[in-house]
A protein has these predicted regions:
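Active-site-proximal alpha-helix that buttresses catalytic centers in soluble enzyme cores
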Residues: 1-188
């Protein structure tokens, strides 16, 4: 969850205050309606940082890839960079080959109990219309290359679709299917 990520950052960087801002107004509105919790959007979070006298702004997005929301975030931060002495923006989770390898290690370690040859292990991400959607195909290719032949990667909103994953699973003679998220938040 986002809260667990924030807690880990606070522990790792105790000299910094951790604050939350979401890029999706749809999610902000949903959380407000469901939980009556107000979350800043990017503009509000940046304004709050300026008003609080923040000198060094460090932004660590929880995006999986360099998609449209990440690009919009980077652009908005750049427009406001003069309001701070220093601005640092982290990269999304799946940026370098080493990132992919680390995620593959984490997800296969977390699901190894299911990897019995009779179970298809499927990970679903959000997906995007942007070129960055290729991270899902790359993840699938790397899983296959590393011998994880019972692992499948798909997306909710793009390619490979759920139907694509189901078709691949049907090609095997699996007795069970395990479905896991490849996302931080559920989205809209």
């Amino acid at each position: 969850t986002i809260g667990a990520i924030e807690d880990a950052i606070e522990k790792a960087e105790p000299d910094f205050s951790v604050r939350r801002g979401f890029t999706s107004q749809i999610i902000i509105d949903h959380v407000k309606k469901r939980d009556d919790v107000t979350i800043d959007n990017v503009t509000e979070a940046l304004d709050r940082a300026v008003n609080n006298g923040v000198k060094t702004l460090v932004v660590q997005p929880t995006h999986l890839m360099n998609g449209l929301e990440y690009t919009d975030l980077v652009n908005e931060i750049a427009e406001n960079a003069d309001s701070f002495e220093k601005v640092v923006v982290g990269e999304p989770l799946l940026t370098s080959d080493d990132d992919f390898k680390a995620v593959i290690q984490a997800i296969t370690d977390a699901t190894k109990e299911y990897d019995d040859g009779e179970t298809a292990i499927c990970f679903m991400g959000h997906g995007t219309e942007a070129d960055s959607n290729q991270v899902y195909a790359k993840m699938q290719d790397m899983l296959t290359e590393e011998g994880f032949e019972h692992y499948y990667v798909g997306t909710v909103e793009a390619e490979p679709s759920l139907d694509d994953v189901i078709a691949k699973v049907k090609e095997g003679e699996y007795k069970k299917v395990v479905l896991e998220p490849l996302m931080i938040v559920a989205g809209d």
